[in-house]
Swiss-Prot record:
Cofactor (UniProt): Mn(2+)
Protein biosynthesis is among the record's keywords: no
Cofactor note: Binds 1 Mn(2+) ion per subunit.
Enzyme Commission number, as recorded: 4.1.1.49
Pfam families, per database record: PEPCK_ATP
Name of this protein: Phosphoenolpyruvate carboxykinase (ATP)
Quaternary structure (record): Monomer.
PANTHER family given in the database record: PHOSPHOENOLPYRUVATE CARBOXYKINASE (ATP), PHOSPHOENOLPYRUVATE CARBOXYKINASE ATP
Subcellular localization, as worded in the UniProt entry: Cytoplasm
PROSITE patterns linked to this entry: PEPCK_ATP (PS00532)
Binding annotation for substrate: R64, Y205, K211, R331
Primary role: Involved in the gluconeogenesis. Catalyzes the conversion of oxaloacetate (OAA) to phosphoenolpyruvate (PEP) through direct phosphoryl transfer between the nucleoside triphosphate and OAA.
GO biological process: gluconeogenesis
Length: 538
């Protein structure tokens, strides 16, 4: 049994005092009762749906709030963090010690004198590099979310549990002094790497806790030579591992959830001397337009203990997955064992042989699949191109092109080239091949079908793409197959999907120019300059 007085004293040391009661690492049964009990109001209230899963609303924040993210500037971070600058805008904004103290006071005061949920869990499936994380919240469903998403310790692992990082979620409190402090708004997601603390205020969105710890793994692991990746991963019967990089909405969760392969994880992984390992104990899947036909595994995972966010629940308790009226970024979190075909008992496997970059090209220019050279691998990894899809972040609803370094710039704590170097080293050591897969649109104006994309992924994983005859796509100089089993041959060359090929040419020149302009920020050193030739020619 965990000594709750010890936990109370540890919270006291952080500034949380007069704790009424601690609900420590509650069971799913207990969480279900807590989040659905009568009398809960507003965003604390959970609704039981027909599937048995509980649905909650996260309020005005239906996605992360990157503009409200800060890291305390101190001796540890000043020369290591990839700080935002005019040349390279990112979400790592510096915060002073004084502002940090003020925000910490707000959050600890909010959590004091309350009945608190405390979840102790791990981030990272490898015992020697994992973070021991303690999450403190007054909201039952937020405790449920982190129980789903982080790795659940055994009773033995909880004995003498010592957190490396504490997440204090004060979603009910906002910062009245934000203007004087020069912050973006009254809401905040702030990190102090020296103290090992994350503070959340004003936003109820569960993903801030998950992605907050991902940003921290992205700080600590590459400094140890371990690749830290915004990707999903799975493994075949022969032990062949594949990783799928991609931004939100490009198909990471969908495409790695494959009945023929065991899932390692759907979003965040490390790659060390032993192989690829998951950071998480759950999945966080988008549910907009979810159907049992297209995504049977995810659909089936939505049952008791799963937690739905911002979906529309009908009067009879059924869920309308097609309704995006609250947000296009409707989500479900569930423990990873809700998927039948997973790697057990620990979510890790060997070295990756296939590295797949997923992009959703709103321009209709890129081919559905191309095989990359080592130089192109670095170029497209650093470019991290996709179309931002509807609603995965606050204030974005239409597809617009975006370049996000390493397919996850929002979560990078170090300079992007550090991630590229570590990844390519790991790939070279393992003899891994890289592919660029476009799950977006083509000249027909429609999105490439999930059936064709799955056929492409199968061809990569079973090696048949290696036997295919290859052509070259001009401007981008990408190697593209002329035919693949189970894939509509008419889509493999994007030029063929346009009534007039000149249309493709014009769009391709436009997109190539955007790639070139974006990549300028990496050409300040020789390594970056050397990669320019691997990119498109504007």
């Amino acid at each position: 049994m965990t000594d709750l007085n010890k936990v109370i004293n540890e919270l006291g040391a952080l500034g949380i005092h007069d704790v009424k009661e601690i609900v420590y690492n509650p069971s799913y049964e207990q969480l279900f009762e807590e989040e659905t009990k009568p009398g809960l109001e507003g965003y604390e209230k959970g609704i039981v749906t027909q599937s048995g899963a509980v649905a909650v609303d996260t309020g005005i924040f239906t996605g992360r709030s990157p503009k409200d993210k800060y890291i305390v500037l101190d001796d540890k971070t000043k020369d290591t963090v990839w700080w935002t600058s005019d040349a390279a805008k990112n979400d790592n904004k510096p915060m002073t010690q004084d502002t940090w103290k003020s925000l910490k006071g707000l959050v600890t005061e909010q959590l004091s004198g309350k009945r608190l949920f405390v979840i102790d869990a791990f981030c990272g499936a490898n015992a020697d590099t994992r973070l021991s994380v303690r999450i403190v919240t007054e909201v039952a469903w937020q405790a449920h979310f982190v129980k789903n998403m982080f790795i659940r310790p055994t009773e033995a692992e909880l004995v003498g549990f010592k957190p490396d990082f504490v997440v204090m979620n004060g979603s009910k409190v906002t910062n009245p002094n934000w203007k004087e402090q020069g912050l973006n708004s009254e809401n905040f997601v702030a990190f102090n790497l020296t103290e090992g603390v994350q503070l959340i205020g004003g936003t109820w969105y569960g993903g801030e806790m998950k992605k907050g710890m991902f940003s921290m793994m992205n700080y600590f692991l590459p400094l140890k030579g371990i690749a830290s990746m915004h990707c999903s991963a799975n493994v075949g019967e022969k032990g062949d591992v594949a990783v799928f990089f991609g931004l939100s909405g490009t198909g990471k969760t969908t495409l790695s959830t494959d009945p023929k392969r065991q899932l390692i994880g759907d979003d965040e992984h490390g790659w060390d001397d032993d192989g690829v390992f998951n950071y998480e104990g759950g999945c966080y899947a988008k549910t907009i337009k979810l159907s049992p036909e297209n995504e049977p595994d995810i659909y089936k995972a939505i049952k008791r203990d799963a937690l739905l966010e911002n979906v529309v629940v009908r009067a009879d308790g059924s869920v309308d997955y097609d309704d995006g009226s609250k947000t296009e970024n409707t989500r479900v979190s569930y423990p990873i064992y809700h998927i039948d075909n997973i790697v057990t008992p620990v979510s890790k496997a060997g070295h990756a042989k296939k590295v797949i970059f997923l992009t959703a090209d709103a321009f209709g220019v890129l081919p559905p699949v191309s095989k990359l050279t080592p130089e192109q691998t670095k170029y497209y990894f650093l470019s991290g191109f996709t179309a931002k899809l509807a609603g995965t972040e606050r204030g974005i609803t239409e597809p617009t092109p975006t370049f996000s370094a390493c397919f996850g710039a929002a979560f990078l704590s170090l300079h992007p080239t550090q991630y590229a170097e570590v990844l390519v080293k790991r790939m070279e050591a393992a003899g891994a091949e890289a592919y660029l897969v476009n799950t977006g649109w083509n000249g027909t104006g429609k999105r490439i079908s999930i059936k064709d994309t799955r056929g492409i992924i199968d061809a990569i994983l079973d090696g048949s793409i290696e036997k295919a005859e290859m052509g070259k796509l001009p401007i981008f100089d990408l190697a593209i197959p002329t035919a693949l089993p189970g894939v509509d041959p008419a889509i493999l060359d994007p030029r063929d999907t346009y009534a007039d090929k000149a249309q493709w040419q014009a769009k391709a020149e436009d997109l190539a120019g955007r790639f070139v302009k974006n990549f300028e920020k990496y050409t300040t050193n020789d390594e970056g300059k050397a990669l320019v030739a691997a990119g498109p020619k504007a």
